């Protein structure tokens, strides 16, 4: 009796492809980390492993003038911006998902249209408004304040998730005497935690990695720089300490990697369930 080796070969092929893809994405980070532990001279060579492990590079980066200020600014931008986005987007998404009112479809179309609008289209008018009219140039407030008025992508993602919550739960809460606000706070929000977590992570990662925004509004004030923009200061006009640049990059990447590692279950669940019902 001849054995069928096709399932075994398929299993080997799939796992080999998965391992190859994993190595393709992981190896650049390994190279980044190893380079961060090299001396300044060795970082310019083709060596892959440090001759001496220069852990002091991280201390040098940490004590770089302004680095802690960039950390504080980034936490303010990402943390406060994420909080404002969630607070402002949840009520709008709830109304679009669970209320029946005239103009609901038009409102949803406007949200989708806002998602399709390239950010570069509004850069000049937004800069003229925040920097010239309100004189907020040199600060991060032109990036934080707009988040208090909702984000189209966050509203759409939350709306899709809230559609998966059965209306019977809301009807039961209303029968028990709950108003819409109490229903939202006591019934909807606890059930919408995965969707809210996904939106919060998307917004936090966007703000943490944002380079374009701080470059426009805060480039002339080093005290308002964020980590992503502050990394540019490690590049010299004639010489760049690549070991310190790589060490700074690791310190910038580490918080978001750790955050995603601990929140990935809620993130994946929230993103998956947003596509269940339309």
Model-inferred region functions:
Residues 1-2:
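N-terminal hydrophobic targeting signals that begin at the initiator methionine
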Residues 5-6, 10-278:
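A structural signal for multi-pass alpha-helical bundles of membrane permease subunits
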């Amino acid at each position: 009796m001849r054995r069928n080796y096709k399932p075994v070969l398929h299993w080997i092929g799939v796992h080999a492809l998965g391992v190859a893809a994993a190595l393709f994405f992981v190896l650049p980070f390994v190279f980044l980390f190893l380079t961060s532990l090299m001396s300044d001279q060795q970082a310019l060579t083709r060596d892959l492993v440090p001759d001496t492990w220069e852990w002091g590079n991280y201390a040098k980066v940490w004590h770089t003038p302004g680095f802690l200020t960039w950390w504080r600014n980034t936490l303010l931008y990402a943390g406060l911006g994420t909080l404002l986005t969630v607070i402002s987007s949840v009520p709008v998404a709830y109304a679009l998902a669970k209320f029946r009112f005239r103009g609901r479809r038009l409102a949803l179309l406007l949200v989708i249209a806002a998602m399709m609008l390239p950010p570069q289209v509004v850069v000049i008018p937004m800069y003229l408004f925040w920097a010239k009219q309100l004189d907020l140039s040199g600060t991060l407030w032109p990036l934080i304040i707009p988040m208090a008025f909702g984000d189209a992508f966050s509203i759409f993602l939350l709306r899709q998730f809230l559609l998966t919550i059965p209306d019977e739960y809301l009807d039961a809460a209303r029968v028990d005497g709950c108003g819409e606000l109490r229903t939202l706070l006591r019934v909807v929000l606890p059930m919408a935690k995965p969707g809210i977590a996904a939106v919060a992570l998307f917004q936090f990662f966007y703000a943490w990695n944002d380079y374009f925004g701080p470059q426009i509004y805060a480039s002339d004030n080093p005290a308002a720089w964020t980590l992503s923009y502050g990394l540019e200061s490690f590049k010299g006009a004639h010489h760049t300490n690549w070991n310190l640049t790589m060490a700074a990059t690791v310190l910038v990447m580490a918080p978001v990697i750790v955050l995603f590692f601990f929140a990935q279950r809620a993130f994946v669940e929230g993103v998956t369930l947003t596509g269940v019902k339309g």
